[in-house]
């Protein structure tokens, strides 16, 4: 067995070495040039500059949060979705112990707003995460002020404007349990919710298994709030992650991670009930968010790297790396050995890439999993770091 491992790692080393230059993006290009291998229609490089505010869970008033104690630390990792409520307050973020925190200014910092599980007092350990929940994909309903979110263990949840214990909205679709509810969006005109169920086998705690195992068991789902009926609108998806509704509600986008494809489901119009490919991404997508003008921002977990290509040649290769490598090393190799940040803006009409923002050195931000644009600002979140960044584009 040891000799087999040595041969495999030797092969990996030679593969990475021989392909290293091919997948690099030149970080020294001018702002008016195309982005390396992304080329041509793949937009322009907009560097992330010093006009970035960085808020973390390590300071800025967290010690003033009610009910805070040393046994129940405020920051245990973030979901990467800095949601903003209809009044412009926040951002709101979810953490690994099942809570949703709200930024309440410099004096109060992050305060507890809501939580997924009634077992709140026992949720200070990662070991009980499946029972305590993991808030993902925060979306506010404008007319009610209610916060809807996907929980990576418990399904789709809802909490009122005043916060507190969330209630379950849906955890089963067509007789099958929702295993890994991911990002969601709300169609307020149709009173419907769209969300991804990333896998029928793995939940949030097994995220790497979910997209390296090769199983196409992910689903995009529509839930009718009036009839309380849920139906699958797209199936056989390979780890669908981000999801967003178009500005006119005519279509829904769902991002597959391994294939780098953005699938489109037509909810209205002459093509209603059909699906097609909306875009091909230059990396592995996390969340996708619609802008106020109808375009879309996609956060890329990482660019396509030699290691990621190798690990997805065949499911057994990915499973081999999961079993033999520590999670930290697996993430490091997927990032190409250098944590960085890449955000892509897609045209809401054509799916073409309009703009790319990249911090190739990871100096200002890295490991981003969400980009949300509002009032001339870009909000970034991270699934691996207890951080929220805001970039003032004005």
From Swiss-Prot:
Residues 61-92 are annotated as: Disordered. It is found in: Vacuole. GO terms for cellular component: vacuole. Residues 1-21 form the signal peptide. Keywords: Glycoprotein, Signal, Vacuole. Its main location: other. Glycans are attached at residues 67, 122, 196. It comes from the Eukaryota. Gene3D superfamilies: TolB, C-terminal domain. It holds the Pfam family Str_synth. Residues 61-73 have a biased composition (Basic and acidic residues). Belongs to the strictosidine synthase family. This is Protein STRICTOSIDINE SYNTHASE-LIKE 1. It comes from Arabidopsis thaliana (Mouse-ear cress). The gene is SSL1.
